[in-house]
From Swiss-Prot:
Top EC class, one word: hydrolase
EC numbers, comma separated: 3.6.1.-
Co-factor requirement: a divalent metal cation
Disulfide bonds: none
Alphabetic keyword roster: Cytoplasm, Hydrolase, Nucleotide metabolism
Stated name of the protein: 7-methyl-GTP pyrophosphatase
Classification via Pfam families: Maf
Cited function: Nucleoside triphosphate pyrophosphatase that hydrolyzes 7-methyl-GTP (m(7)GTP). May have a dual role in cell division arrest and in preventing the incorporation of modified nucleotides into cellular nucleic acids.
Gene Ontology CC annotation, any one: cytoplasm
Presence of the UniProt keyword Cytoplasm in the record: yes
Record keyword Hydrolase present: yes
Catalytic activity: N(7)-methyl-GTP + H2O = N(7)-methyl-GMP + diphosphate + H(+)
Source organism per UniProt: Pseudoalteromonas atlantica (strain T6c / ATCC BAA-1087)
Length: 194
């Protein structure tokens, strides 16, 4: 089995390493601009599938594509990119429930069989002061993360509760769903753990 993660994200790579199965990483190409009136669910499913397909053009094997966005009050939040936007995002999220949509796609590039699913995960934020938000951003600099936080780091202090079936989903790669998808492709991860 040749498993390829269609991602340059160090977070997704770290998550997949938890399974102790061999894999490589490849840089995908996909236009991440949402289409007109595209829902968060549809957007992440489309992008996860496109990322896997883009890598499948040049590489053979089972290719994992993934994409994630956060949604609050019906608005899709992407990666902030800088401190000012991150501050604005966290101010907007303060005291609210945020739903994270994570698209996961598995492509067999030899047969072109592809399955795509979307996992959701809810995060309930504490009411945060401007001082708390500024201090958090000073310490963690989560500018490359949807929602402007790292739940696997200091970001956990921003939340009052979490609700979802797999905490890895929140970081960007739903492992429980991935193991089930691999099984559908007749891959038992236990046989490949090293």
């Amino acid at each position: 089995m040749k498993l390829i993660l269609a991602s340059t994200s160090p977070y997704r790579k770290n998550i997949l390493e938890k399974l102790c199965i061999p894999f490589s990483c490849a840089s995908p190409s996909a236009d991440e601009t949402p289409m007109n009136n595209e829902s968060a669910n549809t957007l992440v499913a489309r992008l996860a599938a496109e990322k896997a397909l883009s890598v499948g053009v040049t590489q053979k094997g089972l290719i994992i594509g993934s994409d994630q966005v956060a949604c609050v009050d019906g608005v899709i939040l992407g990666k902030p990119g800088n401190k000012l936007k991150a501050f604005d995002q966290l101010t907007q999220l303060s005291g609210k429930t945020v739903t994270f949509f994570t698209g996961l796609s598995l492509l067999d590039s030899k047969t072109q069989r592809q399955e795509t699913i979307v996992e959701t995960f809810d995060v309930i934020f504490k009411s945060l002061s401007a001082k708390q938000i500024s201090r958090y951003l000073e310490l963690e600099e989560p500018y490359d993360c949807a929602g402007s936080f790292k739940s696997e780091g200091l970001g956990i202090a921003l939340f009052s509760s979490l609700d979802g079936r797999d905490p890895n989903t929140l970081i960007g790669l739903p492992l429980i769903a991935l193991v089930a998808m691999l099984k559908k492709f007749e891959i038992d991860v236990f046989e490949h753990m090293q």
